[in-house]
């Protein structure tokens, strides 16, 4: 088990509905990460932007983008996280992939599809949570709109690290900032949020605010950047253990199950 986990957040603009251009761009950005890192986190739908044009852009799970993620993870000896559009059994999914350096991978389908943008009319909602054990860290990943639903992310001491990847628009960025911090505090877990920047072809503007928070809600990244950047932060398991033992907030939680 590793006490330290180095996490790199990679915030970027995206080429609209252009997987080849986005893969090339992220190949260069990942290659330019100078320090060693254990985990690299990309935005939601990093190959296309947040589009409903799934019938044109969807891939099979074993398609080109997953192959690309495996190559990047192996080259950097780091796990790589991001989502893209997957077609499976006549359904489309906004599917997150957690790809390890050895090529093993895990998937999570976005649970809460964004009805305001009619995402629910195009994409099928996921039904299962995902918890990954990576280097002795228990990691629970989510996608964008999931952030607004705290019960879905409720921690019963099952995980150490929350990850949210997003295309979260500038006009609602206050909610993003507030809820990322809240998810860290209420679950006594590190919380990583990676959002995109730029403007998409639906005229949505994005200003990033990617960040990492500790178990008490302290922001560990240097600032809420609004441009394209990466930053690597070292997380410490001993911090989680000591703060949970001291405060014991999770022991006082209500006990219930989701149907």
Where are these regions (language model features)?
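Cys-nucleophile CN-hydrolase/nitrilase-fold catalytic domain and related Cys-dependent amidase chemistry
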Residues: 19-20, 27-101, 169-183, 189
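Active-site catalytic loop in hydrolytic enzyme cores
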Residues: 87-157, 171-178, 239-250
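Beta-strand-turn-beta hairpins that frame and shape the catalytic cleft
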Residues: 1-8, 131-140, 161
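Long hydrophobic alpha-helical segments typical of transmembrane helices together
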Residues: 206-259
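Short hydrophobic-aromatic micro-motifs
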Residues: 40-41, 137-143, 163-164, 192
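N-terminal active-site segment of His-dependent metallophosphoesterases
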Residues: 1-39, 163
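Short beta-strand scaffold segments in enzyme catalytic cores
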Residues: 82-84, 95-98, 130, 210-212, ...
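CN hydrolase (nitrilase-like) catalytic-core segments centered on the catalytic cysteine
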Residues: 64-81, 148-228
């Amino acid at each position: 088990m590793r006490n330290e986990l180095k996490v790199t957040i990679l915030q970027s603009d995206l080429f609209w509905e252009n997987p080849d251009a986005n893969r090339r761009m992220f190949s260069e950005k990942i290659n330019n990460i100078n320090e060693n890192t254990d985990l690299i986190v990309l935005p939601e739908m990093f190959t296309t932007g947040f589009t409903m044009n799934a019938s044109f852009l969807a891939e099979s799970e074993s398609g080109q983008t997953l192959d690309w993620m495996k190559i990047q993870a192996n080259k950097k000896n780091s796990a790589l996280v991001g989502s893209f559009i997957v077609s499976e059994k006549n359904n489309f999914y906004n599917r997150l992939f957690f790809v390890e350096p050895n090529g093993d991978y895990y998937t999570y389908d976005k649970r809460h599809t964004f009805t305001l943008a009619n995402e629910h009319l195009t994409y099928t909602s996921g039904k299962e949570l995902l918890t990954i054990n990576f280097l002795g860290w228990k990691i629970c990943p989510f996608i964008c709109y999931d952030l607004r639903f705290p019960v879905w992310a409720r921690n019963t001491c099952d995980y150490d690290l929350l990850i949210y990847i997003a295309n979260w628009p500038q006009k609602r960025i206050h909610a993003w900032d507030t809820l990322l911090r809240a998810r860290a505090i209420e679950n006594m877990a590190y919380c990583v949020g990676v959002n995109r920047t730029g403007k998409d072809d639906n005229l949505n503007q994005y200003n990033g605010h990617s960040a990492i928070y500790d178990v008490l809600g302290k922001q560990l990244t240097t600032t809420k950047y609004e441009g394209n950047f990466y930053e690597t932060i070292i997380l410490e398991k001993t911090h989680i253990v000591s703060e949970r033992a001291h405060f014991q907030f999770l022991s006082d939680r209500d006990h219930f199950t989701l149907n």
